[in-house]
C-alpha cells in the first residue's frame, strides 16, 4: 500500500453528494491457521432482540433482506483464534493490494495439526453488499497458487455466476464465465491469459478493463478497500498515518486534538519537527513501510499537555501506549463515520492500553450515529457485556477444541434472555469461551 492511498481517505469528505454503501453480511474460513472446519462470523441480526439503533436495513436491490448488525465484539482466551480471524478477513484485501504478477507467496497458512489438511488449500468465503447489490466471493488457495476463485452476484435476489476459476493437479485450470458477465468471449479469454497462478482473476480483469466495463469493479473495490483490518501491529502504521496527515493539514490536526480531548486525553497542541532528509526523500508515491521508517526517524511529533500548573511538551514516544493507540485508531474512526460512504472496520484488540470507559464511549457513539458502517473488534474487556449497549447476537466467542481447532460462535446460540447479566454468566462458563486454568 502506498502513502497516496492512505491520504486518499480524506477525499470522501470533499464529495458529500456521493454515497457508497459497503456492508458485510458474513465471513467464513476453514483450513487457515487455527481454523480447521468451516467457521462463520455473521453480521445478520437475529429478529426480536430490540435495540433498533444497533441494526440497520441494508437496502439490497430487489430483496427484502434481513437487518444487519452495526457492531460485533469477539471474546475468547489467549491463543483461541481471535487474531487469526482478523488475519483471515484481511487476506483477500491484502492479496488485492499486491501488484499482480509479482512473485509473492499468498499469505495462506493451513491448519497444521491435521496432516491431511497441510497440503490442501485454505478456504475463504465472504458475502457482502456493495452499491445495493449482493455478492458472494469464494477463494481457495495455498501459499503458491489459487485453486478456486468464484464470484456470484444476486440481481433481484437470484443467484447468478459472474465467473469461476478452478484448478486441480490432475487437470488444467478451468474457467467458467457466466452469461451475464460483460466483455464477451475475446475479452474474457484475454483476462484469463493475463492471470498468473498466484494472483486473483478479479484483479486482472479490473486492471485490464476499458472504462465501459465496470461490472467487476464494484466487488473489486469492496474487497480491496471497504474492509480496514487493523492487526496488533497495524495500529502503529495508522498512528504514523495520522501524524502524516496532520503535517499536511491544520484542519486535520485540529480534528485529532478534538477527538483526543473528547476522550479526556489532555493534549492541547501538536507540532512537528521534520529533518531535511525527510523533506527531500518523502513523496506522495512513497511506500508506506518506507514512510513509516522516515516518520519515526526523521519527523518528530511533539505533543503539548496543559494542566493547572501550565503547559509541558512531550515527544510522541513518551506518550502512553493508550494515547499512541488512540492516535492510531483515529483514521479508522474517520473511516467509519465519513459522510460519503459506509465501511467495515475490523480491529484486533480494540481495548489494548485503552480504558474500558473510552472503549464503551467509542462503541456507543458508533451505535447512535446514523450510519451503516460496521465495527468488528476483538477484546478481553468484559465491561461491555455489562453495559447493555450490545445485543446478545453482537457478542461472539472463540475457543479451541481438543484438536487445537478454533470454534466461533455467538452468545445468542445459547438459551437466555435479553435482560440477563451476560458478563456474570460468561464468567460462570455458561457460554464457554473461557481459559481453562490450573493452580500451580
Per-region residue spans from a language model:
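Switch/communication elements of ASCE P-loop NTPase nucleotide-binding domains
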Residues: 2-93, 306-439
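Conserved P-loop NTP-binding catalytic core
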Residues: 20, 57-73, 77, 86-146
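Extended helical coiled-coil dimerization/tether regions that scaffold
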Residues: 22, 30, 236-318, 437-440
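Short polybasic amphipathic segments
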Residues: 27, 124-126, 146-153, 299-307, ...
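Glycine-centered tight beta-turn/hairpin loop motif at sheet-sheet or coil-to-beta transitions
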Residues: 34, 130-134, 156, 308-311
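Coil-to-beta-strand transition motifs
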Residues: 36, 119-121, 132-134, 143-147, ...
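Short, surface-exposed charged micro-motifs
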Residues: 40, 125, 136-140, 291, ...
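Electropositive, glycine-dotted interaction segments
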Residues: 136-279
Amino acid at each position: 500500500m502506498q502513502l497516496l492511498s492512505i491520504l486518499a481517505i480524506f477525499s470522501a469528505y470533499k464529495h458529500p453528494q456521493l454515497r457508497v454503501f459497503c456492508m458485510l453480511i458474513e465471513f467464513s474460513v476453514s483450513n487457515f491457521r487455527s481454523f480447521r472446519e468451516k467457521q462463520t462470523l455473521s453480521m445478520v441480526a437475529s429478529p426480536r432482540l430490540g435495540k433498533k439503533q444497533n441494526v440497520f436495513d441494508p437496502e439490497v436491490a430487489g430483496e427484502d433482506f434481513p437487518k444487519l448488525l452495526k457492531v460485533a465484539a469477539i471474546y475468547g482466551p489467549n491463543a483461541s483464534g481471535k487474531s487469526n480471524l482478523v488475519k483471515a478477513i484481511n487476506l483477500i484485501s491484502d492479496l488485492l493490494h499486491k501488484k499482480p504478477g509479482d512473485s509473492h507467496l499468498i499469505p495462506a497458512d493451513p491448519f497444521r495439526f491435521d496432516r491431511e489438511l497441510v497440503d490442501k488449500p485454505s478456504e475463504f468465503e465472504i458475502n457482502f453488499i456493495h452499491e445495493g447489490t449482493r455478492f458472494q466471493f469464494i477463494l481457495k488457495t495455498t501459499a503458491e497458487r489459487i485453486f478456486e476463485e468464484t464470484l456470484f452476484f444476486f440481481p433481484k435476489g437470484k443467484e447468478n455466476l459472474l465467473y469461476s476459476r478452478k484448478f486441480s493437479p490432475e487437470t488444467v485450470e478451468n474457467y467458467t464465465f457466466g452469461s451475464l458477465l460483460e466483455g464477451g468471449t475475446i475479452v474474457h479469454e484475454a483476462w484469463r491469459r493475463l492471470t498468473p497462478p498466484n494472483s486473483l482473476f478479479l484483479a486482472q480483469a479490473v486492471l485490464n478493463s476499458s472504462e465501459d466495463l465496470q461490472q467487476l469493479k464494484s466487488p473489486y473495490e469492496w474487497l480491496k478497500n471497504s474492509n480496514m483490518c487493523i492487526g496488533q501491529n497495524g495500529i502503529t502504521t495508522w498512528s504514523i498515518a495520522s501524524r502524516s496527515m496532520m503535517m499536511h493539514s491544520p484542519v486535520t490536526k485540529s480534528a485529532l486534538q478534538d477527538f483526543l480531548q473528547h476522550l479526556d486525553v489532555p493534549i492541547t497542541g501538536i507540532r512537528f519537527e521534520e529533518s531535511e532528509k525527510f523533506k527531500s526523500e518523502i513523496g506522495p508515491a512513497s511506500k508506506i513501510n518506507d514512510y513509516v521508517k522516515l516518520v519515526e526517524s526523521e519527523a518528530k511529533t511533539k505533543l503539548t499537555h496543559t494542566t493547572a500548573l501550565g503547559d509541558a511538551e512531550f515527544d510522541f514516544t513518551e506518550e502512553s501506549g493508550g494515547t499512541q493507540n488512540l492516535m492510531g485508531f483515529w483514521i479508522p474512526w474517520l473511516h467509519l463515520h465519513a459522510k460519503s460512504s459506509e465501511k467495515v472496520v475490523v480491529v484486533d484488540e480494540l481495548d489494548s492500553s485503552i480504558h474500558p470507559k473510552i472503549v464503551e464511549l467509542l462503541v456507543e457513539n458508533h451505535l447512535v450515529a446514523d450510519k451503516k458502517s460496521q465495527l468488528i473488534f476483538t477484546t478481553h474487556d468484559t465491561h461491555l457485556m455489562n453495559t447493555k449497549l450490545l445485543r446478545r447476537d453482537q457478542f461472539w466467542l472463540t475457543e479451541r477444541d481438543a484438536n487445537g481447532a478454533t470454534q466461533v460462535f455467538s452468545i445468542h446460540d445459547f438459551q437466555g434472555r435479553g435482560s440477563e447479566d451476560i458478563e456474570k454468566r460468561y464468567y460462570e462458563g455458561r457460554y464457554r469461551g473461557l481459559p481453562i486454568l490450573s493452580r500451580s
